[in-house]
UniProtKB/Swiss-Prot annotation:
Has antibacterial activity against the Gram-positive bacterium S.aureus ATCC 25923 (MIC=18 uM) and the Gram-negative bacterium E.coli ATCC 25726 (MIC=36 uM). One of its GO terms (cellular component) is extracellular region. This is Brevinin-2HSa. Expressed by the skin glands. Pfam families: Antimicrobial_2. It comes from Odorrana hosii (Hose's rock frog). One of its GO terms (biological process) is defense response to bacterium. Belongs to the frog skin active peptide (FSAP) family. Brevinin subfamily. Disulfide bonds join C27-C33. Keywords: Amphibian defense peptide, Antibiotic, Antimicrobial, Disulfide bond, Secreted. The lineage of its organism: Eukaryota, Metazoa, Chordata, Craniata, Vertebrata. It is found in: Secreted.
Length: 33
């Protein structure tokens, strides 16, 4: 349904945001950016 679609969108957005934050943190820590 629509709610499931919205839920999946929110989950994917959260995953994407979390992934980019993790990438930024790890590159800052290892000074590779």
């Amino acid at each position: 349904g629509l709610l499931d679609s919205l839920k999946n969108l929110a989950i994917n957005a959260a995953k994407g945001a979390g992934q980019s934050v993790l990438n930024t943190l790890s590159c800052k820590l290892s000074k590779t950016c």
